[in-house]
């Protein structure tokens, strides 16, 4: 069964065709990074206008690469939230238009669930119950999954998301946008020599990164940072220490079979290394191209929703503030 996935929640316009929820036939992403980097962050109005220009060519390329016509598509899965309203509207309306014109079922997908399904596209099928650490630009969530479509939120950030913290720290250090990859690169030539705080929040699986960011800012303002690479490595280590330790504690408490990693920050090299080295349980870490925003993960998640009866009407709307549990 082939699913067409469409994703436009932030600054990537993406379309993909996935067979049976696990085989990627095509996965096209048109990135707007070059456009937004001159502003140091995503400009929502610019993003939605760019999605409008890219959406139809990207969908058409994805179908062509998969050698698939609309008549072979069993359902269209599209991200309807969370994300930027103007960006989401473009993908959702493209999906609705095709669904209406071709009589194809429409399946709305929560972007955060989509990120988790990168783990179903990585060659091995995860075992339930599993604990997923989703770390992206807008979210840092620890989610327990006991089956497809069953999400229980065990912990979340109380302030900045991990990706947001990376992006803000990069700005403080004068590194390029997007900040996460820039800090990752700079860290490779640095030593984690700065003493930065870690927020453990005892008795809770929640996270907090705003104090760490402020501590870095103070050190920079006081002239106590002599090497950008060392500061980047110190900041990255502080974030990763907390993410890994809290994830392993939570996995132990809930007695899961496996840990899954998801979201853009899952592309971080130190996080990938530390989590797999320190975990006594199997850890699923998707390839980097499936961690950042793409439509194959939306198609995969949409497939598992669709085969268990999930389908949406054409009056389905965007939900910019959707959480991992609704
Ligand atoms: O999941 P994503 O592509 O978009 C959202 O849904 O937010 O995540 C984007 C976030 C950005 O904050 C970016 O800086 C971060 O993921 N990121 C990284 C790395 N690659 C992307 N953070 C740390 N290390 C990386 N290598
Ligand atoms: Zn994302």
UniProtKB/Swiss-Prot annotation:
Binding site for Fe cation: 111, 115, 293
Gene Ontology molecular function: iron ion binding; N(6)-L-threonylcarbamoyladenine synthase activity
Pfam families, sorted: TsaD
Keyword entries, A-Z: Acyltransferase, Cytoplasm, Iron, Metal-binding, Transferase, tRNA processing
Cofactor binding: number and manner: Binds 1 Fe(2+) ion per subunit.
Swiss-Prot/TrEMBL catalytic activity: L-threonylcarbamoyladenylate + adenosine(37) in tRNA = N(6)-L-threonylcarbamoyladenosine(37) in tRNA + AMP + H(+)
Top-tier EC class: transferase
A Gene Ontology cellular-component term: cytoplasm
Highest rank taxon of the organism: Bacteria
Primary localization class, coarse: cytoplasm
UniProt-listed GO biological process terms: tRNA threonylcarbamoyladenosine modification
Cofactors named for this entry: Fe(2+)
Localisation per UniProt entry: Cytoplasm
Residues where substrate binds: 134-138, 167, 180, 184, 268
EC number, as in UniProt: 2.3.1.234
Primary role: Required for the formation of a threonylcarbamoyl group on adenosine at position 37 (t(6)A37) in tRNAs that read codons beginning with adenine. Is involved in the transfer of the threonylcarbamoyl moiety of threonylcarbamoyl-AMP (TC-AMP) to the N6 group of A37, together with TsaE and TsaB. TsaD likely plays a direct catalytic role in this reaction.
Family listed: Belongs to the KAE1 / TsaD family.
PANTHER family linked to this entry: TRNA N6-ADENOSINE THREONYLCARBAMOYLTRANSFERASE, TRNA N6-ADENOSINE THREONYLCARBAMOYLTRANSFERASE, MITOCHONDRIAL
Name of the featured protein: tRNA N6-adenosine threonylcarbamoyltransferase
Organism: Dehalococcoides mccartyi (strain ATCC BAA-2266 / KCTC 15142 / 195)
